[in-house]
Amino acid sequence: MSDISPQISNAYEPSAAQKASGLLKIYLYKSYFNNRFVEVNCQGNTNNTGNNGAGKTSLLSLIPIFYGAEPNAVVSREAGKLSFVQYYLPSPSSMIAFEYLHQGEERCVVLYSNASMLYYRFVSCSGKDLFSLENMRAHAEFNDTREWLKSYIAKNYHVSLQLSSTLDYRTIIQN
């Protein structure tokens, strides 16, 4: 009689498809961190530390947004708190960008506001390229993310049409 024991492995090995897709980084520009550029690596382990009210939970709340969660469902509106757009994208120059892999290629999706509405645009470049010094100097001149994307960035990279529906965005990002 032989002893047959199940083999248990604690090591997680992502599939080839998983290695070829997924969230890489989150970029915040003039968002809830006033007039700052913030880059957060989402690969491997990340340690977010800070005092109470520093924005750690607000940052973590952005991850479900990338995967298609309704933005206003992420922000608590109790006690007169701001909407998603008012909190995360307070000015026309504010933006959130998610850098991700799609079929092995680095791409970005940029969230921005215009007239209190949230919009999404896909850009066929890496975050490093999108936020290059030259591109950010141009953004400072435009001082409007919507115009910067369609009038400047679109000259060098494919920029999608503006999406105003989270459902449309979710369909694309989850496909």
Mark where each language-model region is.
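Extreme N-terminal "head/tail" segments of very large remodeling/mechanoenzyme assemblies
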Residues: 1-128, 142, 159
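Electropositive, glycine-dotted interaction segments
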Residues: 112-175
